[in-house]
Amino acid sequence: MNLKEVSELRRRFRMDRNAISRIYGCFVNSSREIVSYIDESMGILPQDEAEKYLNLLKKALSGKIGKNLIDIIFSTEQVADSDEHRLLVALRDSELKDGEIREEFYQKIINSLDLGDSNYLILLAYDTYDVPCKNKNDEMDADASDAVFSYVVCCVCPVKERKAELGFFPGDNEFHSCAGQIVAAPELGFLFPAFDDRAANIYNALFYSRKTDEIHQEVIDSVFHTTAPMSAAEQKEAFQNALSEALGDACNMELVQSIHDRLRDQIEQHKESHDPEPLELSVSDAAAILRDNGVEEEKILAFRDNCFAQFGDGATLNPANLIDSSRFEVKTADATISLDPEHSYLVETRIIDGRKYLLIPADEDIEVNGFGVRVKGE
């Protein structure tokens, strides 16, 4: 799914735009026991409660494509005949009304999910969307629809203890200590089937993970029986390792600055283009950046081999997963320097009297802990 398709579905999660009739789910304690079930009619819930449920489900479609939102791809064999795909289709086709099917799904989550000692809430909703046609100007015509997209959305939310505080009790007309448990933002979730080319794609699901470095592979294994792509954090680490191992001493400050600048430029240009498809960088594109910076061909070939070993032949990478485009950071054992990426060129490396130094020009005023200071010898 691309950004436009995700955004189109996210707009469904408003009281006046969705066709969700019931909310289902269960509350699970830290011992993996179901404490209670949820089976609520959206029509009789107070509006503020209904909106809170919708907001939680909506968050399972939030974040960045390729970072928080990950495509899950089923094989042809799985779609043709597999328990995991059959269960997901049954959830959708039953409109979540079959309690036994829901229970089977809950147990798949409960038996696999590791949230430590946290209690959590599993939420499920079924929706049908009359997909509006688009006119020749790529604008939606709300009065014209030739397809219906039926889907299930799920999210898993930690339930946290609230600290005891004083609260007013109108019946007693007094203040007393009160505590309780609150539902936090979803830790993970998914949409099935995917909404590709504005239509159902039963070969794909869209998985959500709040943390980009912890995508809960254990749940993906249990529910989908597939291997998810590398997390954004894993991609970044693998790319850095491929680069540093291949380049060795040639991996200097100037080269890393140039790579960061080139990738950052690509990210910014992609944002400005409003292209809904994720930005992609091939291994050959990355190798070309090294070549433009005068890296020896032997080291470039070693880098390519490392990338293929890490990511697979023909792999494409998302530059947004490889660098932090919002900052440029230099670390030593005892210090960290963080700069606006546009000014990364200010940092230089020098060897003076046999010692390595990082140099930053200080042409303007200098502050230390808020105090204006002067440089000796000025």
Identify the function of each model-found stretch.
Residues E277, A286-E378:
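C-terminal, beta-strand-rich globular interaction domains
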Residues R11-R17, S21-D324:
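Long, hydrophobic alpha/beta structural blocks
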